[in-house]
Amino acid sequence: MKFKVINEKISNLMVDILIIGIYEEVKSLGDVHHTMDQQLGGLIQEMINAEEFKGEEGETLLVHTLGRVPAKKCILLGLGKAEAFKENNLRNVVAKVMREARKSRAETIAITPFGICNHISAEKVGQAIAEGTKLGLYQFNHYKTTAKEQEERVLQEVYILNEETGITAQLQTGIDTGEKLAHATMIARDLVNEPGNVLTPTEMAKRAQSISQKHGLELEILEKEDMERLGMGCFLGVTAGSEEPPKLMVLKYNGGEEGGEILGLVGKGLTFDSGGISIKPGEGMDAMKGDMGGAAAVLGAMEAIGALKPKTNVIAVVGACENMPSGKAYKPGDILTSKGGKTVEILNTDAEGRLVLVDCVSYALQLGATRLVDLATLTGACLIALGTTTTALISNDELWVKQIEDASKNAGEQVWQLPSFPEYKEMIKSEIADLKNIGGKYAGAITAGLFVGEFAEGKPWVHMDIAGTSMSDKEKGYITKGGTGVAVRTLYELAKSMEK
């Protein structure tokens, strides 16, 4: 798929589908659309007058041009209220209309910036259109073998009409950024959607190697023997029951000043989580192939960072393994010793992600990370608390939280900080070890996050629980069913915000 900014009259475009954006409560078309509507015999204005099309956000209506203009078809696209229309609204409506266009098997599409460059920068407009298009059209279907999927026509070209003078370069810059961020997000989506028999820890390491080679990132892959030497008792406890060897991946991007801040990104990579000895119910266990959403987000972020090259330093640490029951598996009642030296009483083997994370956090600090973000599909409690639209944050540093919140706003992703009062830390203290790996049935998302925070060694740290946002069971805007690639763009924006 190619994007191209062009200076052309809307009524002269010879494309399969022309997308015309209309705000809610608009009673008459602007000059650009009015000329074309005249060629269509006033059909669009007539439908607006009859309230057959109201311009509500995401509303679409297909119009056949019947040869009156070069474009074969038009799709009227509702933009909602003008004063409320922001970048994420644009990203979402573009995704929706592109899916509608796909149903018509369109190969060429033209879209206007809808005049919104007046209150959104041209660069952000181009970025949102590119992201909305690519993310909205994303499909994970390469395991399908039927002729229908093989024969489906693919969108080839998207033309963005430049309605104003002097903004072509800004639109193109935004498009280039949006394409790279969308590609990185789709890498994360693919990782989450892959079946567990394909995406083993070994395969994840190969994907990490591909990203590092593409962008010239430093790469280190630690094997089980390396983890034993480093004293990663918590990580090794989780992986003990599996026949698949664990992998710990380290990717380094050096784009900032030598001796400057180093952003540490840590991802939980459980390529399959059965729950171990504390085994999960059979219903829904298939979704546990996606318990590596944190690792997917980190690897996707490193793809974005490698492609867009912000002027900052980043270390990514990804711990990949399986959690399986066997005669060698770790058990409730065991006590494990972490790389950081703290001992952990195991009360439930299905609270394993935090055990992988703490050893990875300790290693990131050993490698020089000065600020930390860990990401994980960690708790069902987070899903209960915040649902499927919002990622939970737990932190030890309010300024660092604010920086991540700002990054998430720039990315169009929702986050919400949960409390971290001292009383919650009391819930994870053990009577026979330093810590226990669950804190009881209350405040589960908070206590799980604070467990990881015990290993941050006082460095600014934020835990992102993406249990509710890593996968979606329906299409909504640029989010498609399956893996969402959540946090990839937020992490890139965070890295960019650290530029000096």
Curated annotation (Swiss-Prot):
Keyword annotations from UniProtKB, A to Z: Aminopeptidase, Cytoplasm, Hydrolase, Manganese, Metal-binding, Protease
Catalyses which reaction(s): Release of an N-terminal amino acid, Xaa-|-Yaa-, in which Xaa is preferably Leu, but may be other amino acids including Pro although not Arg or Lys, and Yaa may be Pro. Amino acid amides and methyl esters are also readily hydrolyzed, but rates on arylamides are exceedingly low; Release of an N-terminal amino acid, preferentially leucine, but not glutamic or aspartic acids
Co-factor remark: Binds 2 manganese ions per subunit.
InterPro entries: Leucine_aapep/pepB (IPR011356), Macro_dom-like (IPR043472), Peptidase_M17_C (IPR000819), Peptidase_M17_leu_NH2_pept (IPR023042), Peptidase_M17_N (IPR008283)
GO biological process per UniProt: proteolysis
CDD domains: Peptidase_M17 (cd00433)
Cofactor(s) needed by this chain: Mn(2+)
Domain of life: Bacteria
Binding site for Mn(2+) 2: K268, D273, D291, E352
List of residues binding Mn(2+) 1: D273, D350, E352
GO molecular function, one term: manganese ion binding
Subcellular location: Cytoplasm
Entry-linked Pfam families: Peptidase_M17 (PF00883), Peptidase_M17_N (PF02789)
Role played: Presumably involved in the processing and regular turnover of intracellular proteins. Catalyzes the removal of unsubstituted N-terminal amino acids from various peptides.
Similarity remark: Belongs to the peptidase M17 family.
The protein's name in its UniProt record: Probable cytosol aminopeptidase
Organism of provenance: Alkaliphilus metalliredigens (strain QYMF)
Taxonomy of the source species: Bacteria, Bacillati, Bacillota, Clostridia, Peptostreptococcales
